């Protein structure tokens, strides 16, 4: 039998000074409406056509973008300047590759193209019966590891040859609401979860093609079985800790083990500091013991035997189980999903008390570890945006929760929750900390929004461009902050009225695009099923003819059906008077190893992308795309691994 400690109900008095708020549990979220992916294709197309009609009526909100240059020069990594003659703009990569045709750079009147897209959406519905194979990929992407891609197609953007940076994705744990001083724990009895033969196939039951739904199923597995995703998000997310005690030591066993760690160290060039830390916390002193160079097994295990903790900063790069979990969860959360693992010997502690800037999910894999959680000390530390320094035991107060995790258990706590953990006598500990929502708050969005909104407002409002009063400095600043003169009060009213002019709905779109663009750089490359690989560029078959030609055996026609590989695989962004299509199929499993990947497209090609985004996970025949050179457009996306394609 497993027990799931779910809800920290009755708040106990806070023994520390009353500097924090009392966080009440949120009401369960209302059931969401069916997503477009769950509706019939006809309903989806009708809905999109109505949206296009409304957009056409609201002409004042659509800007006419100036035409962009047909080509531009960019320096490659060796410092040479190259001019791309291809209709696809890119920053040059090192080896010269065949030209990718299809996407020109030219911004035109958006309203005309919206009308074209609306007609194309109607055409998709009309041709639905004619396209016999519009349902692609019978199973979700459940776990074949992505092989190294061959560089046979021309990159549409430049992937910078940036040296691998020091990995910053360290164990961080996201902030949490203010004082939740728990006491009573509701315990539910559940049958023991049956052992899963392979972690890579446990979510295949729904058969969904929507990558967000597949990610939701993976998250349900992480927090399950007795609490649903909706219940968790309504009652615990960013509010208070959540504990699951499963009594199932095999639940997370396929993620990693000491044996897999040893194999990883032997077969890969794991470096101290960049990939792995050796730490200790003794008598109130936190130390890092990293030597230089490669972390070889004899040295790492010697540190471990001496009582040091081992922290791996990017296990998803080397361990397939962790990679499979993270790559699915990033689709659900639509933000960077990181992981660290921590291996701690018996009777020891590796880290001082602290809080982190991420939402933390602790997945206990081996051994036992005793955890202590503490409320944020002040209101400003609730859902903290920056991780804390190390604290002394005297600075953190009394624990709100103490628990010993055993294999198969889960502990979640929001950012800002102070925590520390140590192994118990006679038991080592191995756990994975999965982290999400770093720098993904409303404040982070508004930091992107305000510069755009202010710039736009200054163009539209003369009052914002007028000069400030000559005597403004005599009424504001530290020296004058306690003044209550009539002039100061009038100026405050004036400034408030100017701030009111800054709001811009268009700037919200720009800011969200920039946030989503950041995700494209942060994201792990997608994990493909065998069937997906066969229908993408990664599984392309070529004929090696006696005459020396190497033709592609996959024929693209207007009856070929396509769809995006993942819901969040691309983001169309308007920046620098150019439409750019950011994507992450060419990312490395190592965080920010390369510069962001993007294609530069014209308005015609952008409408084709917009159609694919809006009908996902449905497919569309190439002949129904609202672009001029339909087949070349589809090939350009296919060559970058962005779509799956199925012939007649």
Swiss-Prot record:
Its cofactor is Fe(2+). One of its GO terms (molecular function) is histone H3K36 demethylase activity. Residues 17-28 have a biased composition (Low complexity). It is found in: Nucleus. Residues 308-453 form the JmjC domain. Its main location: nucleus. GO terms for cellular component: nucleolus; nucleus. Its EC number is 1.14.11.-, 1.14.11.27. Fe cation binds at residues 354, 356, 419. It comes from the Eukaryota. This is Bifunctional lysine-specific demethylase and histidyl-hydroxylase NO66. It comes from Culex quinquefasciatus (Southern house mosquito). The lineage of its organism: Eukaryota, Metazoa, Ecdysozoa, Arthropoda, Hexapoda.
